[in-house]
Design a protein with these regions (language model features):
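Short, low-complexity, intrinsically disordered N-terminal peptides in bacterial proteins
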Residues: 1-3, 207-208
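Short beta-edge/loop segments at beta->alpha junctions of small alpha/beta modules
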Residues: 2-78
Length: 208
């Protein structure tokens, strides 16, 4: 007789194993059930509200899902947290950012879910560096260093994909390191933007 899967026990085991973001294949292996039974249990508990679908074949626990940075890392790989999300995390921009932005070497994608939006922007493989493993809310996540987050951001400003934020906080940025990361993109416009933001940083703050 097949073992009956109980919601509470399933939730606790997924948490204990660090599988708060999981696929049907992983669920099948953990609970030693057929792929069909795993899919049926997940489908049933999407309707009941235990699980949330993040994208095709990726799910999380609705009421106790892990940190958004951790979800972003797992949802689309390879990737690391960067751009506005990392700039806010490192306090380079003052705004609170809603949604999560990451860098990937794969095709740019966006996933809209009931727990938040996850955006991934493509860069070339040669520039896919400058990130580190950090502990955020008990989870180990890949996130851009401050200088790389800014270099990534200025790359997309130069491409006219995003607007330049006029309230960048550069006090803790290593300018030489920023320039080295910027050179990886081989776009002279990024170096001009770096000069511009440092000139702007010396001006008196605007009164809004």
């Amino acid at each position: 007789m097949a073992l009956k899967l109980k919601r509470i026990e399933v939730e606790e085991k997924l948490k204990d194993l660090g599988l708060e973001v999981f696929t049907p294949q992983e669920f099948k292996g953990v609970f030693n059930v057929s792929l069909k039974r795993a899919a049926n249990f997940i489908s049933s508990n999407l309707r009941s509200g235990l699980f949330v679908k993040l994208r095709n074949n990726f799910y999380t626990i609705k009421d106790s899902h892990p940190d958004y940075f951790f979800i972003a890392n797992k949802l689309y790989q390879p990737s690391y947290i960067s751009l506005e999300t990392a700039l806010s995390y490192h306090k380079i921009i003052p705004e609170v950012v809603y949604g999560n932005t990451s860098i990937t070497t794969k095709t740019s994608r966006e996933f809209e879910t009931s727990i938040g939006n996850f955006t991934y922007r493509h860069i070339k493989t040669e520039a896919f560096t400058g990130y580190e493993l950090r502990e955020v809310d008990r989870y180990k996540v890949l996130i851009a260093e401050p200088e790389k987050a800014l270099a990534d951001y200025l790359y997309f400003v130069d491409l006219k994909k995003v607007s330049l934020n006029d309230r960048l906080k550069l006090r803790n940025i290593d300018r030489s390191k920023l320039i080295e990361y910027a050179k990886m993109f081989k776009r002279p416009g990024i170096l001009k933007l770096i000069n511009q933001i440092y000139v702007d940083a010396r001006k008196p703050p605007k009164i809004y």
